[in-house]
Amino acid sequence: MPRAVNGTIHKNRRRRVLKDAKGFRGARSKLYRTAKSAVMKAGQWAYRDRRAKKRDFRKLWIIRINAAARENGLSYSVFMNSLKKLGINMDRKSLAELAFNDREVFNALVEKIKVAG
């Protein structure tokens, strides 16, 4: 019995890889062998960047909080330390949201810190 080379499992695997490579440039979206390596590499980058995204957003939040705090005469570290001392448990994401979109509330927090300390 001859060897089957056009089986459904084989075709489905190749079709899935080429589907995942859709939108890639040149041969990376057309040829199975290059598409397979491109999809593998894209998966590695996606895995790495899902973790890096968390670090990047935390950095962005800190930058926004620091900028808003410095407009009111406080550094980021003094601002965060004072919040902890006052027992105000807000995460950096929500503080950055206040600093970026609702400056009046953020300024009220700063005034509360200045009155207390």
Curated annotation (Swiss-Prot):
Q: Which cysteines are joined by disulfide bonds?
A: none
Q: Which GO terms describe its molecular function?
A: rRNA binding; structural constituent of ribosome
Query: Which CDD domains does the UniProt entry name for this protein?
Result: Ribosomal_L20
Name the UniProt key words of this record, in alphabetical order. Ribonucleoprotein, Ribosomal protein, RNA-binding, rRNA-binding
What Pfam families does the entry give? Ribosomal_L20
The UniProt entry, under PROSITE patterns, shows:
RIBOSOMAL_L20 (PS00937)
Q: Which GO biological process entries does UniProt record here?
A: ribosomal large subunit assembly; translation
* InterPro entries, sorted: Ribosomal_bL20 (IPR005813), RIBOSOMAL_L20_CS (IPR049946), Ribosomal_protein_bL20_C (IPR035566)
Does the record's keyword annotation contain Cell division?
no
A cellular component term from Gene Ontology for this protein is: ribosome
Family membership noted in the UniProt record: Belongs to the bacterial ribosomal protein bL20 family.
Name the NCBIfam families on file.
rplT_bact (TIGR01032)
Q: What does this protein do?
A: Binds directly to 23S ribosomal RNA and is necessary for the in vitro assembly process of the 50S ribosomal subunit. It is not involved in the protein synthesizing functions of that subunit.
Q: Specify the protein name.
A: Large ribosomal subunit protein bL20
Gene source species: Leptospira borgpetersenii serovar Hardjo-bovis (strain JB197)
Q: What is the lineage of its organism?
A: Bacteria, Pseudomonadati, Spirochaetota, Spirochaetia, Leptospirales
